[in-house]
Amino acid sequence: MAYSYTEKKRIRKNFGKLPSVMDAPYLLSIQVDSYRTFLQDGKSPKNREDIGLQAAFRSVFPIESYSGNAALEFVEYGLGKPEFDVRECILRGSTYAAPMRVKIRLIIKDRETKSIKDVREQEVYMGEIPLMTENGTFVINGTERVIVSQLHRSPGVFFDHDKGKTHSSGKVLYSARIIPYRGSWLDFEFDAKDLVYVRIDRRRKLLASVILRALGYNNAQILDLFYEKVPVYLDFGSYQIDLVPERLRGEMAQFDIADNDGKVIVEQGKRINARHVRQMEASGLTKLSVPDEYLYERITAEDITLRDGDVIAANTLLSHEIMVKLAEGGVKQFNILYTNDIDHGSFVADTLRADTTMGREDALVEIYKVMRPGEPPTKEAAENLFNNLFFSSERYDLSPVGRMKFNRRLGRPYEVGTDQKSREVEGILSNEDIIDVLRTLVEIRNGKGEVDDIDHLGNRRVRSVGEMTENQFRVGLVRVERAVKERLSQAETDNLSPQDLINAKPVAAAIKEFFGSSQLSQFMDQNNPLSEITHKRRVSALGPGGLTRERAGFEVRDVHQTHYGRVCPIETPEGPNIGLINSLSVYAKANDFGFLETPYRKVVDGRVSDDVEYLSAIEEVGTVIAQADSAVDADGHLMEEMVSVRHQGEFVRMPPEKVTHMDVSAQQVVSVAASLIPFLEHDDANRALMGSNMQRQAVPTLLADKPLVGTGMEANVARDSGVCVIAKRGGMIEFVDASRVVIRVNEEEMIAGEAGVDIYNLIKYTRSNQNTCINQKVLVNLGDKVGRGDVLADGPSTDGGELALGQNMRVAFMTWNGYNYEDSILLSERVLQEDRLTSIHIQELSCVARDTKLGAEEITADIPNVGEAALSKLDESGIVYIGAEVTAGDILVGKVTPKGETQLTPEEKLLRAIFGEKAADVKDSSLRVPSGTKGTVIDVQVFTRDGLEKDDRALAIEKAQLDAYRKDLKEEYKIFEEAARERIVRLLNGQESNGGGTTKRGDKLSDDVLSGLELVDLLDIQPTDEGIAERLSQIQVFLKEKSAEIDEKFAEKKRKLATGDELTTGVLKVVKVYLAVKRRIQPGDKMAGRHGNKGVVSNILPVEDMPHDANGVPVDVVLNPLGVPSRMNVGQILETHLGLAAKGLGEQIDKMLQQQRTIAELRIFLDKIYNKVGGEQEELDTLTDEEILVLAGNLRKGVPLATPVFDGAEEGQIKELLELAELPRTGQQILFDGRTGEQFDRPVTVGYMYMLKLNHLVDDKMHARSTGSYSLVTQQPLGGKAQFGGQRFGEMEVWALEAYGAAYTLQEMLTVKSDDVEGRTRIYKNIVDGNHYMDPGMPESFNVLTKEIRSLGINIELKNGD
């Protein structure tokens, strides 16, 4: 195994025993692929498939005028270049989008001959379409957003029952529902009397026969569709029927059944069983004589015409009178329906009999009345309405998915139609479709077949970004279509062009509304790389067209057996959304139909192959799947006699020959966040859920520290989240500094004619959506050789290209003076000194200058009534300097607002006369630092409205940006020139010159000659080899193009910066100030491990007071041992033991390095760690001595270990490693009290645990209020930090004071501290005067109560007793 540049610096020892068949796929593919498919941007218009945008256009166009003489046709669409790049859009607060132009063709026909008279083609601007960034997000109005995928009910047909809840008798009522992708729902349902009803769009129910009549069937045809016939023969006054013995099975014999010899096979009153059926078949009976009573209540199958011309209608119940009529009417033979009470109910026939409608017209009118109540029905209107409901491709679409599910459920074959026409035909319902659904429903009612499981993942599909955007786009286009149809009739006469006909605003509005305010377009959770990835891989059952929290029951939220490998059973929010919002499993992906698939290895005749097959939940039915950890021999044969498998949702044991598939990985079940929890298999599911949710809230620490005990998924998450800088092509590091890396690309990876230079610009100290800090740090050195996919720079919360959410802390499980009561956490001051849990938060504060009625607001340093000291941090323009350290109340941006004329006091008049006008007519409305905040200004951005003159600060910022950009471009060009020069020297070395430059014809070109020449001279040389001459000219052309491109880029940047900014109406200027706040850990901050073990820091002790071991090493964290047993998350204890071993091994290596042992000894020790304890073998022999030294140096602080989920380290292996590290096998040590030096009673579990600092910091939560704003009605203080509110003193708190008898305190709480308006003003004045006297009055809420009672019409008055 070859190690990459990043891997070999720090190899993670992996305990996984199972072979890796496939690597985890790209984790953001569900987002990226979906949107790429939607746009089809890379494909030429001719080759675009009929999906996504193309399909949306195709479905709406061509648009024809009402007369049919003019039509608009869609030709192709194209996307332009976005005006600003992603970073600029975030800064400017604009949307990252590309303009879309659509080529439209207008065809005008001759009115009489209908031949084409005129064709006009034109490009029409259709608004902007948001583009996805590389990492699967969208930038909308300057904020990064994620479109969450939706898990909704798949279109198709579903059969269900009410579980006996509807009717009081508890009878189970069956129903069928046809759900289209868009259009009306069609429901069939039984009632308690076993009649079949139909509902359209959940409206009032009609008898199901109404819709059959509307489809054009009469009674006899309907009966023919649903029933088999039984011929009845009338012979000499007795009746005979054809005998089909199988049909009689299970019925009660109403008379003796005898064979031809008169031997009785079944006696009257006995139930006919399988033995009787066999006897009847053996006896050779073909006809059966039946008594008249047997035929009573049977149903006629068709109209029977009597001798005298009378007709007995189909679907008539036979009775004595009718039988007499038949005999007298000379009928020798007629058909009845085959019905019985067991498995051939007469439901459809009974429904027909109950139906009062006579023919098709009646039925259509009935349907019209239900759909359009109150409108007078006409024949045409009823006909149109019915046809538009299910048979018009404009109004109804099952979609390919729906048609596939529909045909599958009804047991029909299905192939996807590729062309538009066949898609439209398959998208609408046919008569057969409706009849087949009804037939299946009746069969299920008859006891044949099963109802569907709604929560089966074969009946729920994922709608991703692309599909949702396409639907919104189609909505916009349909709005456009309506407007265009109106105008098309004008186009025939007024000579209009496509541009005049199409107004793109509705399309743009629909798209903007979706991305801006849809429930599924969410503000990206950007706490750390894991939270980003998880947010993009989320699937939600909520949202438009989905469930609502209130209506979702337990079944929908529950884990279903089909979730295995598709949706994570662990990661879901706690609270009202539990089970409705899920996360995709690591290996899951959505197929073309939107159903979730998971990979399996194929198993043939008990032998496991390496072929991987993705199966959806539908395809998985009937397969036999072995677990990933099933024992397999060297040839891949399953070794156990009976293998534990999953079959039809159950766990059973089967012989190897029956196994069809096998899991690809033990981590297949869980999501990315859950797969990052080591020893997950030893944790209770509830705690694992908390663990995976809390990892997403971890704040990136100042110094990222990789976990000593990981799971091997860390590198995947860091790579795919996009926070690291990854090399796109391999090569050599040509230049590196804090803000950029330049790579000279390998020859073999270059494209012909390019200079082969890749430049990576790093992101420095930027604010994330959650106000955490995004910063990238370089990992490579000058001259290093890197390969494609290597990590060049770490992002936030990554260390060496691995996810690093927290810190490895030395923990002890013991009690310490009550400081770990109720899960509190005791920390050592050392953690604070080493800045281990320090994080940087960046806040954005903005100041907006508007145009008001009284005049424009102005940003200035000339602020009335403010001393010099307050202005000391501002420049001449009134904006704070970068680097200024500011605290609460400091002015960041000076701003004055004009105020209206007021009556002046004599003193003010005097001031005005002395100091001039300025101070009087403006008020100070500057931007100040909010209370409780203290930090350093790290950046300032000034945006000025187009057309206004920019102030000095804005010009200075602009100049600095231009200078930096020019420097960048110059360096870029210089790098290209150097690379080109090197290539030219390489090409010309050893060649013969044909003259040109400073060489003469026939000169041999050697390295010495060439290296002394300038690039210009080198380009002039003409070698004799034509191939090389050709390549030289290519390089020359490339350099010219590059130079022109760089000039163009600079001019473009200058133009962008010079033009003003698009600000909202009435805004003249916006100043954004960015503050960096350093947050050290302090009591009140929330911390957690990865196993759901969370707590609040209770105290930070001096290092010398912390418990320490015999060597004097103090612990960093003291945790409560009582937090483990009841919560059943034992994973944390195993992690602690393994962490201790990892740290101990690191110390051993450190000791060896300090003693300067030989590299051979080092190799032996490393081999013991990596290859002698079990798990995956590492090939350390492939590393050079130098690389071994680098590796050992990086392992000094601990050897990183990986214990994959469900395939992790075993107890024995942990003990072996502890022994190797020369530590006690128990993982427990004797500790001493730091204050007294006394030994604690018993050994304590000490080790290293990975602890996270969560984004619930006490600084963000705590605030203090003296006076502030009050609620309007109750006059009580508001609540919450944002409103600068007070602390609620509720009902229970009042009880507490009553119990203590603290009457005065209680009176103070309920009056002057709350809503006694006069009392509180009085006490405020008193306190200011230094007098604490309280004079309570009437609380305002009492007045509110009396007013409420009065509003009920009860007169209540307060009498003041003297």
UniProtKB/Swiss-Prot annotation:
Keywords: DNA-directed RNA polymerase, Nucleotidyltransferase, Transcription, Transferase. It comes from the Bacteria. One of its GO terms (cellular component) is DNA-directed RNA polymerase complex. Pfam families: RNA_pol_Rpb2_1 (PF04563), RNA_pol_Rpb2_2 (PF04561), RNA_pol_Rpb2_3 (PF04565), RNA_pol_Rpb2_45 (PF10385), RNA_pol_Rpb2_6 (PF00562), RNA_pol_Rpb2_7 (PF04560). It catalyses: RNA(n) + a ribonucleoside 5'-triphosphate = RNA(n+1) + diphosphate. InterPro entries: DNA-dir_RNA_pol_bsu_ext_1_sf, DNA-dir_RNA_pol_bsu_external_1, DNA-dir_RNA_pol_su2, DNA-dir_RNAP_su2_dom, DNA-dir_RNAP_su2_hyb_sf, RNA_pol_bsu_bac, RNA_pol_bsu_CS, RNA_pol_bsu_protrusion. The keyword Acetylation does not apply. One of its GO terms (biological process) is DNA-templated transcription. The RNAP catalytic core consists of 2 alpha, 1 beta, 1 beta' and 1 omega subunit. When a sigma factor is associated with the core the holoenzyme is formed, which can initiate transcription. DNA-dependent RNA polymerase catalyzes the transcription of DNA into RNA using the four ribonucleoside triphosphates as substrates. This is DNA-directed RNA polymerase subunit beta. The gene is rpoB.
